[in-house]
Amino acid sequence: MSKIAVVYWTGTGNTEEMANAVAQGAEAAGAEAKAVLVSDFSADEVGDCDAVAFGCPAMGAEELEPDEFEPVWEACKGVLGQKPVALFGSYGWGGGEWMDSWKEDAEAAGLKVVDVLIANEAPDEEAVEACGALGRQLAEA
């Protein structure tokens, strides 16, 4: 059974809802998965995981949350190696450019990004289903 951490930061609860759906999808595919706030996760825990999903909403000028999420993300990039990674998050304006930049950053670091997913504002039923599919995809990667 693979072990997957779904690490997220949320400001309004939208990304938390997405994280829970990703974890449920991974569990449905037979993985052991847990959604965990970024403040409760460290790069030291990456070694215990077979795959990791990271969730962060767009902040400010289409960027990652700088105080809690980004430092953990930066630390994890150096230890993920070729473990499958998924990226997800919500946004309220713009077109989701932060996700394009985030994916480029991950790939430039040599990470194996299996997929990305964005939702505008609160995830609707379609977005929640897509999050579940993302979790299943990560579990099967």
Residue ranges and their predicted role:
Residues 3-4, 14-17, 21-38, 48-141:
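FMN-binding flavodoxin-like domain, especially the glycine-rich phosphate-binding loop
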Residues 41:
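Helix-turn-helix
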Residues 8-12:
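Aromatic-flanked redox-active Cys/Sec active sites in thiol-based oxidoreductases
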